[in-house]
A protein has these predicted regions:
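Beta-strand-rich interaction surfaces with strong enrichment in secreted/lumenal proteins
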Residues: 2-6
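A metal-dependent hydrolase metal-coordination microenvironment
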Residues: 65-197
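Non-catalytic propeptide/linker segments at domain boundaries
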Residues: 8-11, 16-79
Protein backbone atom coordinates (compact mmCIF):
# COMPACT_ATOMS: atom_id res chain seq x y z
CA UNK A 1 0.00 0.00 0.00
CA UNK A 2 1.17 3.50 -0.69
CA UNK A 3 3.60 2.35 -3.35
CA UNK A 4 3.77 3.34 -6.98
CA UNK A 5 3.61 0.31 -9.28
CA UNK A 6 6.03 0.02 -12.15
CA UNK A 7 9.64 -0.54 -13.07
CA UNK A 8 12.48 0.36 -10.74
CA UNK A 9 15.00 1.90 -13.09
CA UNK A 10 18.79 1.83 -12.55
CA UNK A 11 20.15 4.89 -10.81
CA UNK A 12 20.39 6.51 -7.42
CA UNK A 13 17.32 6.22 -5.23
CA UNK A 14 16.55 7.76 -1.84
CA UNK A 15 14.43 6.05 0.78
CA UNK A 16 12.58 8.26 3.23
CA UNK A 17 11.42 6.82 6.53
CA UNK A 18 8.73 8.83 8.28
CA UNK A 19 8.69 8.40 12.04
CA UNK A 20 6.09 10.07 14.21
CA UNK A 21 8.29 11.40 16.98
CA UNK A 22 5.36 11.89 19.35
CA UNK A 23 4.62 8.14 19.22
CA UNK A 24 8.28 7.17 19.54
CA UNK A 25 8.56 9.30 22.68
CA UNK A 26 5.37 7.75 24.10
CA UNK A 27 6.49 4.17 23.43
CA UNK A 28 10.27 4.28 23.87
CA UNK A 29 10.86 7.15 26.27
CA UNK A 30 14.63 7.55 26.47
CA UNK A 31 15.35 4.14 24.93
CA UNK A 32 16.66 3.81 21.40
CA UNK A 33 15.50 1.51 18.65
CA UNK A 34 17.01 0.10 15.50
CA UNK A 35 15.69 0.19 11.93
CA UNK A 36 17.07 -2.42 9.55
CA UNK A 37 16.58 -1.98 5.81
CA UNK A 38 17.45 -4.86 3.50
CA UNK A 39 17.74 -4.31 -0.25
CA UNK A 40 17.59 -7.34 -2.52
CA UNK A 41 16.98 -8.19 -6.15
CA UNK A 42 14.68 -11.03 -5.07
CA UNK A 43 11.03 -10.57 -6.00
CA UNK A 44 8.65 -11.29 -3.12
CA UNK A 45 4.89 -11.27 -2.85
CA UNK A 46 3.44 -8.00 -1.58
CA UNK A 47 1.90 -8.58 1.85
CA UNK A 48 -0.83 -5.93 1.50
CA UNK A 49 -1.47 -5.28 -2.20
CA UNK A 50 -3.97 -2.76 -3.51
CA UNK A 51 -6.10 -5.58 -5.03
CA UNK A 52 -8.26 -3.16 -6.94
CA UNK A 53 -7.93 0.24 -8.54
CA UNK A 54 -4.53 1.87 -8.89
CA UNK A 55 -5.10 5.63 -8.69
CA UNK A 56 -1.69 6.81 -9.88
CA UNK A 57 0.31 6.63 -13.05
CA UNK A 58 3.81 7.95 -13.64
CA UNK A 59 4.45 9.10 -10.10
CA UNK A 60 2.07 10.36 -7.46
CA UNK A 61 -0.45 12.19 -9.67
CA UNK A 62 -4.05 10.97 -9.63
CA UNK A 63 -5.32 11.61 -13.15
CA UNK A 64 -8.74 11.68 -14.79
CA UNK A 65 -7.99 8.25 -16.28
CA UNK A 66 -6.71 6.55 -13.13
CA UNK A 67 -9.44 7.72 -10.71
CA UNK A 68 -13.10 7.95 -11.70
CA UNK A 69 -13.80 11.49 -10.49
CA UNK A 70 -17.11 11.64 -12.37
CA UNK A 71 -18.45 8.31 -11.06
CA UNK A 72 -21.91 8.59 -9.46
CA UNK A 73 -22.32 6.20 -6.54
CA UNK A 74 -25.92 7.16 -5.77
CA UNK A 75 -27.96 9.43 -8.05
CA UNK A 76 -30.49 10.35 -5.35
CA UNK A 77 -30.20 13.44 -3.18
CA UNK A 78 -30.28 12.87 0.56
CA UNK A 79 -28.11 12.34 3.59
CA UNK A 80 -25.00 10.21 3.19
CA UNK A 81 -22.95 8.68 5.95
CA UNK A 82 -19.19 8.36 5.84
CA UNK A 83 -15.88 8.82 7.58
CA UNK A 84 -13.64 11.79 6.75
CA UNK A 85 -10.73 10.90 9.08
CA UNK A 86 -9.31 7.38 8.90
CA UNK A 87 -5.99 5.57 9.13
CA UNK A 88 -4.73 2.19 7.94
CA UNK A 89 -1.42 0.38 8.28
CA UNK A 90 0.06 2.91 5.86
CA UNK A 91 0.46 5.27 8.82
CA UNK A 92 -0.61 4.60 12.41
CA UNK A 93 -3.78 2.55 11.86
CA UNK A 94 -4.09 -1.14 12.56
CA UNK A 95 -6.21 -2.27 9.60
CA UNK A 96 -5.46 -3.29 6.04
CA UNK A 97 -7.34 -1.40 3.34
CA UNK A 98 -9.44 -4.50 2.71
CA UNK A 99 -10.47 -4.84 6.34
CA UNK A 100 -11.13 -1.09 6.64
CA UNK A 101 -13.43 -1.28 3.60
CA UNK A 102 -15.27 -4.32 4.98
CA UNK A 103 -15.87 -2.60 8.33
CA UNK A 104 -17.05 0.59 6.63
CA UNK A 105 -19.47 -1.37 4.44
CA UNK A 106 -20.74 -3.39 7.43
CA UNK A 107 -21.32 -0.10 9.28
CA UNK A 108 -23.49 1.14 6.42
CA UNK A 109 -21.16 3.91 5.30
CA UNK A 110 -21.60 5.42 1.85
CA UNK A 111 -18.14 6.99 1.61
CA UNK A 112 -14.71 6.65 3.15
CA UNK A 113 -11.70 8.99 3.04
CA UNK A 114 -8.31 7.45 3.96
CA UNK A 115 -6.31 10.29 5.53
CA UNK A 116 -2.91 8.95 6.48
CA UNK A 117 -0.34 11.07 8.30
CA UNK A 118 1.65 12.89 5.57
CA UNK A 119 1.08 10.00 3.15
CA UNK A 120 -1.47 9.24 0.46
CA UNK A 121 -2.86 5.98 -0.80
CA UNK A 122 -2.02 5.18 -4.41
CA UNK A 123 -5.05 2.97 -4.88
CA UNK A 124 -7.77 1.07 -3.07
CA UNK A 125 -9.31 -2.38 -3.01
CA UNK A 126 -12.58 -3.19 -4.77
CA UNK A 127 -15.50 -1.86 -2.75
CA UNK A 128 -19.03 -0.51 -3.11
CA UNK A 129 -17.99 2.59 -1.15
CA UNK A 130 -17.08 5.93 -2.64
CA UNK A 131 -13.43 6.13 -1.55
CA UNK A 132 -12.03 9.64 -1.91
CA UNK A 133 -8.25 10.29 -1.89
CA UNK A 134 -7.14 12.29 1.14
CA UNK A 135 -4.23 13.07 3.45
CA UNK A 136 -3.74 14.28 7.03
CA UNK A 137 -1.03 16.94 7.02
CA UNK A 138 0.53 16.34 10.43
CA UNK A 139 2.73 18.81 12.33
CA UNK A 140 3.52 19.51 15.97
CA UNK A 141 1.30 22.62 15.66
CA UNK A 142 -1.76 20.66 14.60
CA UNK A 143 -3.26 18.37 11.98
CA UNK A 144 -5.22 19.27 8.83
CA UNK A 145 -7.07 16.96 6.45
CA UNK A 146 -7.22 17.55 2.71
CA UNK A 147 -10.01 15.76 0.81
CA UNK A 148 -10.15 15.02 -2.91
CA UNK A 149 -6.43 15.39 -3.45
CA UNK A 150 -5.06 14.77 -6.92
CA UNK A 151 -1.40 14.60 -5.88
CA UNK A 152 0.83 14.86 -2.85
CA UNK A 153 0.93 18.41 -1.48
CA UNK A 154 4.05 20.06 -2.91
CA UNK A 155 5.52 21.00 0.48
CA UNK A 156 4.77 17.75 2.34
CA UNK A 157 8.41 16.61 2.45
CA UNK A 158 9.50 20.01 3.79
CA UNK A 159 6.72 19.84 6.38
CA UNK A 160 7.95 16.43 7.55
CA UNK A 161 11.63 17.43 7.46
CA UNK A 162 11.21 20.77 9.26
CA UNK A 163 8.49 19.88 11.77
CA UNK A 164 9.07 21.82 14.98
CA UNK A 165 10.95 24.63 13.22
CA UNK A 166 9.71 28.18 12.61
CA UNK A 167 9.69 27.69 8.81
CA UNK A 168 6.80 25.21 9.18
CA UNK A 169 4.30 28.11 9.18
CA UNK A 170 5.46 29.12 5.69
CA UNK A 171 5.14 25.56 4.37
CA UNK A 172 1.67 25.21 5.89
CA UNK A 173 0.57 28.52 4.34
CA UNK A 174 1.86 27.30 0.96
CA UNK A 175 0.02 23.98 1.39
CA UNK A 176 -3.23 25.75 2.26
CA UNK A 177 -2.81 28.01 -0.80
CA UNK A 178 -2.16 24.97 -3.03
CA UNK A 179 -5.23 23.20 -1.62
CA UNK A 180 -7.37 26.26 -2.31
CA UNK A 181 -6.00 26.58 -5.87
CA UNK A 182 -6.59 22.86 -6.60
CA UNK A 183 -10.08 22.83 -5.08
CA UNK A 184 -9.20 20.38 -2.30
CA UNK A 185 -11.46 20.56 0.75
CA UNK A 186 -9.63 21.50 3.96
CA UNK A 187 -10.52 20.54 7.53
CA UNK A 188 -8.76 21.23 10.84
CA UNK A 189 -8.57 18.03 12.90
CA UNK A 190 -9.18 17.78 16.65
CA UNK A 191 -8.32 21.48 17.29
CA UNK A 192 -8.92 21.25 21.04
CA UNK A 193 -6.91 18.09 21.65
CA UNK A 194 -3.89 19.62 23.36
CA UNK A 195 -1.48 16.71 22.79
CA UNK A 196 -1.37 17.84 19.12
CA UNK A 197 -1.97 21.55 19.87
Amino acid sequence: IGGVPGEIYPGTWKIGIGIFTEYVAQKLGEQTGEIVLTVSDRKDEVSDPICGECWVENGLHISEKSYRWENVFCPESGWYMGDFHTHTRLSDGKETIGHASERAEESGLDFYVPTEHNLMHTGWCKTSLCVLPGIEVTTDKGHMNLFGITEMPEKILEIVKHNGEEIIDTYMDQTIAQAKQKGWIRSINHPFLTIWK
